[in-house]
Amino acid sequence: MDLLSGTHIFAVLLACIVFQSGAQEKNYTIREEMPENVLIGDLLKDLNLSLIPDRSLTTPMQFKLVYKTGDVPLIRIEEGTGEIFTTGARIDREKLCAGIVVDAHCFYEVEVAVLPDEIFRLVKIRFLIEDINDNAPLFPATVINISIPENSAINSRYALPATIDPDTGINGVQNYHLIKGQSIFGLDVIETPEGEKMPQLIVQKELDREEKDTYVMKIKVEDGGFPQRSSTAILQVSVADTNDNRPVFKENEIEVSIPENAPVGSSVTQLHATDADIGENAKIHFYFSNLISNMAKKLFHLNSTTGLITIKEPLDREESPNHKLLVLASDGGLTPARAMVLVNVTDINDNIPSIDIRYIINPINGTVVLSENAPLNTKIALITVTDKDADHNGWVSCFTDHEVPFRLRPVFSNQFLLETAAYLDYESTREYAIKLLAADAGKPPLNQSSMLLIKVKDENDNAPVFTQPFLSLSVPENNSPGTQLTKISAMDADSGRNAEINYLLGFDAPSEFNLDHRTGILTAVKKLDREKQEKYSFTVLAKDNGMPPLMTNATVLVTVLDQNDNSPVFTHNEYNFYVPENLPRHGTVGLITVTDPDYGENSAVILSILDANDDFTIDPQTGVIQPNISFDREKQESYTFYVKAEDGGRISRSSTAKVTINVVDVNDNKPVFVVPSSNYSFELVPPSTNPGTVVFTVVAIDNDTGMNAELRYSMVGGNTKGLFIIDQTSGNITLKEKCVFADLGLHRLVVKAKDLGQPDSLFNVVNVNLFVNESVTNATLIYELVRKNIETPVTQNIETTDASSPSSDYVKIVVAIVAGTITVILVIFITAVVRCQQSPHLKAAQKNKQNSEWVTPNPENRQMIMMKKKKKKKKKHAPKNLLLNFVTIEEAKADGADNNRSSITLDLPIELEEQTMGKYNWGTTPTTFKPDSADLARHYKSASPQPTFQIQPETPLNSKHHIIQELPLDNTFVGCDSISKCSSSSSDPYSVSECSYPVTTFKTPVSVHTRPPMKEAIRFHTPMKETTTVEIWTHPQPQRKSEGKRAGKSQRRVTFHLPEGSQESSSDGGLGDHDTGSLPSTSHALPLGYPQEEYFDHAAPNNRTEGDGNSDPESGK
């Protein structure tokens, strides 16, 4: 429970505690003569009504002043706030509380009703009226005569008549003064036990009547109010003869009781007083003191001679229940005797009860108008019954004389609330004359009655009723606008305007219909279309004219009858389906959906393919399209045809839609590296390169499309020192740290390119060789290091720090010069020997070979191959002697564009040809393969299903070959079998083609040296001769391999005679191990130290053949 709800509950509980009684009293104090609109109090705060939250009440809180019709209230109350203000009526305490005992409190009482019913309370408010000094004290007469005996002793005191001041307290009489008084007299003021201030005249000198018998002076009286008020009178003192005894009452205090119905003249009491004097001085005179009220003087008579008090006017206990009569007895002497007579007026049941009706609901012409839907306990009037009698005679009860839906609920002892006790119904009783009876408990009891008229106001409490709450209609479509459908009628039990009915369409009614609000006629104002909407269900309303109006609703169901006026409709004008290229025949291509808005036979649709398209079939009912062909995106990317839909109407209708089937690519192509073009290239990285510099960029392509061709690069091996990092998106290889001396040398990075194909991605890897050095002083040595790098585990780099130093460079130059000189001499010698042995026929064939297709032997060569096979049977056990191998160097003649290049032809023995050409169909089998990945199989176990390349027993083992690293299952390497492959495509723009052969080793390495900044491309030809020709093109080698740029124009041809049975295997850049079933081989670089991959043409991934990355189909033969 939240805090706000808890506060509300607390307020309600507190209100219940505070208002646990139905009535309350509240006292306020006001001063008389207050001006208009003075704030007296705030009932909302003073009664703690502000604790009740407004939202807990059905209606806002109201405060209503309950007063009698014709009364002029002295206060008013703001109904909404409960603030009490004075009105323009004069608040006069002396008038409101006339006749009360002096100094008694004066109260003014009103009642306030607090509404609504949930918190109804009747609050009795008593206003204590404080006196203000608005009256001046007055002497009983303007001339006061007093007689003083001449023998009065000095300081003798004589009472003077007291003044009358209606004000009380400090505003009453406070002091008396003599104005221009004689020195013979003084004035003193004494206070009686009743609090009355009595002036006394003091004799200050001896009097002598004979000398002066009359003294005249002024006496002034003042009150204590602010502003102070006063009055004066003439005091005339007569000096009289001596009287030295005053009268004495027999009883100083007398209390008598007399019924209020005592007749006028009845005796109340007899006073007795005596005087010791004789003669005239013994004659006693009785009179009322000026202190008694005017009402007492009016009601009672005192015989001045006898002292008998009688009733002067009829008594009324209800007006004044007791009277105090102060009687003075004087013999003409100085001080009169005093006696107090208390007259108690006893009650008799002489007053009938009175009924005072104070309306809470203001009447109109004396009649209360009450709505028939007034809630229970609606407060109508406050009934106050009073009886001026006392005790049982004043006990009054109030009730009604017969059964009515009203009751009187007591709130105070003599006040009742008239409220509704049941719900009213104008239709059953329209007017009530309530007779209120009030009876007292006297004997005999007296009663009073009063009539209260209540008129019940008719309310619109009966809603119209439809004769048919549900109405079902039918109308054919394509009707004429304005067609009358039916007439709707309703009845209302009310009368007058409450029974007048208007017909309305509900908010859910469509615009196709109209309803006359007077007659209730329903019409179709628009042409209806069943295909657009078959059924219309809406509501109609019947509303009377009452306030507030009441309404009821009925449901109308309009059914539109069908006509065949619509053709079949395809959900799309053109359908585009996407199917994978590996979707099998008769699989599901897609679903054609067609609808016919008509009904029944008119909506039965048959589907068919137009133009007798046999590639696809469609189910005439379901619209399922199935292929009769296999898809190949590379052959045809899309198919288009038209489908016809025809309905079964009497006059059939049809429509067509275009269908396009798009063949979606499947991730069936692995990434292919373009840069670097092979595993044998390298990039120079100066040691002064700043960290963050891009030193190389790897580029790979993928024949697939979309996400299948989206590539991500990563390093999966090498980079043992962590010098380099690669950007997975761009392939940029960046230097991570500053190079130090220990970092000089060749660094190998194994870079993986992985596509984002789904569900399975494909990948490939390549070697990136980064040579950290100031310059490339010996390219041959670097390529040799690259070659060794291939045979070295990826966890180890081939460092060349010593070779990069100036001293080692000089040593390498000298060694290279010596080796080159020896090689040239050896080549010249071998060439001369070979040429001497060659016949003219072989030379002619050798020249014709240069212009023939190098991959397809002619018939003459095939015959020579057969002859060589026969001869080699005899030479099968010939010893392997280096001296029997010759190299012949020929100068090629300028011929067109070929005069810019040098070639070297290597003639291999027939045994090598038998081991190569005899096992591969060069004329029919494509030999293209990818120069994209290093031969890493000797360092990893492949998870690929391809044949693996394994180290053979003939290969010299090294500890580095014993490190077998595990790759995750998603690393798939493309294997290359032991049979050599030729490629007509390469990333090197200078090479024409390449072949790799299974060999063991060249026992006499031969290398051709050009300038160090040269790169050489080797082209091998295998004509059907006793020797195998290898054509080597040499080109200038820049420090950084630059693709697409030609260099070098010299050309030489060299022929090598390989030892019998020799085999050479050079990696084609594909990953994987050799098939264990293939010929045993080892992996060595060519004698020239140049990797074959350096001489491929530009990579052409789109020219891949079925032989890429797979074992030769003839290798197992």
Swiss-Prot record:
Residues 1029-1117 are annotated as: Disordered. It comes from the Eukaryota. Expressed in adrenal gland, brain, heart, kidney, lung, prostate, skeletal muscle, testis and thymus. One of its GO terms (cellular component) is plasma membrane. The keyword Calcium applies. SUPFAM superfamilies: Cadherin-like (SSF49313). Glycans are attached at residues 27, 48, 344, 553. Residues 24-812 are extracellular. Residues 1029-1039 have a biased composition (Polar residues). Residues 27-139, 140-249, 250-355, 362-466, 467-570, 571-673, 677-795 form the Cadherin domain. It is a single-pass type I membrane protein. Residues 834-1117 are cytoplasmic. The chain crosses the membrane at residues 813-833. InterPro entries: Cadherin-like_dom, Cadherin-like_sf, Cadherin_CS, Cadherin_N, Protocadherin, Protocadherin/Cadherin-CA. Potential calcium-dependent cell-adhesion protein. This is Protocadherin-11 X-linked. It comes from Sus scrofa. The gene is PCDH11X.
